[in-house]
């Protein structure tokens, strides 16, 4: 599907809303990781067009699973959950990284609605996503393929793929041909210590091809390209690694591509200039236009409809199966 010019403008506006909502959270907390949030914003607004979840019922059995393997991107996760319509308020975002808040420094299962798994140690979330995919295939044997047909999306970065746990679990995923697993690799070539080539020169694409994965690549700031590879990934008969070539700190004036955005808030002047450049009022914080809020909440509207259709499609036998509720 070709995105129209209106679609592209809408996605750009949504991405900037997401970027600076994250930046404001981190600025208020005076702690966090803005680089990944700014760099992945374009990918995430396009993923919003593909993700099948229902924020009014976070435990819907056939929802897509979304794993943030890089748990340090928590501001991005929380901003999206709020914008998509989960039970996470703007005030919750303003309490980011505060004691007893619903928005801790790293995402925690059973603590924040919409978070699928606790993540933090790099590589762990990748393995969790493989486990989710395996679980869905097992669930199909207990129910049926129509009842369990969701995708598992995992967001990972350079650091995740340097860890042994991601290598081992990727090998298993390829061996089992986990075709509902889509890993989006935020390839920005930067870590907290600087350029990734200081410590890592492996050919990641070649590694995953050898492990029996589909490997796709795109410019992580080109909305049409992101959309196209996501469409292709959903049809793959194997697990897919989607390499999104991104710029860490995208939109941060003077700091794009710099490791300085990895684990420190943007300074006040950079944040002000960056907002101005994105045509956002620099004197205001936590701003979400009604139009953009409506666009993000299309995820919820779609999810409610999809769950209703799913319920109707279940066979009488499947509806009586206790596993429907247990999963």
Region locations from a protein language model:
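Glycine-rich ThDP/TPP pyrophosphate-binding loop and its adjacent helix/strand module
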Residues: 54-55, 111-298
């Amino acid at each position: 599907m070709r995105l129209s010019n209106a679609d592209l403008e809408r996605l750009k506006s949504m991405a900037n809303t997401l970027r600076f909502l994250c930046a404001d959270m981190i600025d208020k907390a005076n702690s966090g990781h803005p680089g990944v949030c700014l760099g992945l914003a374009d990918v995430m607004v396009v993923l919003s067009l593909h993700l099948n979840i229902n924020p009014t019922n976070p435990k819907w059995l056939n929802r897509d699973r979304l794993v943030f393997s890089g748990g340090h991107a928590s501001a991005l996760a929380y901003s999206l959950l709020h914008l998509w319509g989960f039970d996470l308020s703007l005030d919750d975002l303003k309490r980011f990284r505060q004691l007893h808040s619903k928005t801790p420094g790293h995402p925690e299962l059973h603590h924040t609605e919409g978070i699928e798994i606790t993540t933090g140690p790099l590589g762990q979330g990748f393995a969790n996503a493989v486990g989710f995919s395996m679980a869905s295939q097992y669930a199909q044997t207990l129910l049926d393929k129509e009842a369990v047909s969701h995708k598992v999306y995992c967001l990972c970065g350079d650091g995740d793929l340097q860890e042994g746990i991601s290598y081992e679990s990727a090998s298993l995923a390829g061996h089992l041909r986990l075709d509902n697993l889509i890993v989006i690799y935020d390839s920005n070539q930067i870590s907290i210590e600087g350029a990734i080539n200081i410590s890592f020169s492996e050919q990641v694409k070649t590694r995953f091809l050898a492990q029996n994965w589909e490997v796709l690549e795109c410019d992580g700031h080109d909305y049409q390209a992101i959309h196209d590879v996501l469409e292709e990934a959903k049809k793959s008969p194997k697990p897919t690694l989607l390499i999104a070539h991104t710029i860490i700190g995208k939109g941060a004036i003077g700091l794009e591509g710099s490791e300085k955005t990895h684990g420190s808030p943007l300074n006040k002047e950079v944040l002000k200039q960056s907002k101005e450049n994105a045509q956002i009022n620099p004197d205001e914080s936590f701003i979400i236009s009604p139009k953009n809020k409506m666009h993000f909440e299309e995820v919820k509207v779609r999810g409610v409809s999809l769950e209703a259709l799913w319920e109707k499609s279940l066979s009488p036998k499947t509806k009586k199966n206790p596993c429907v509720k247990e999963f």
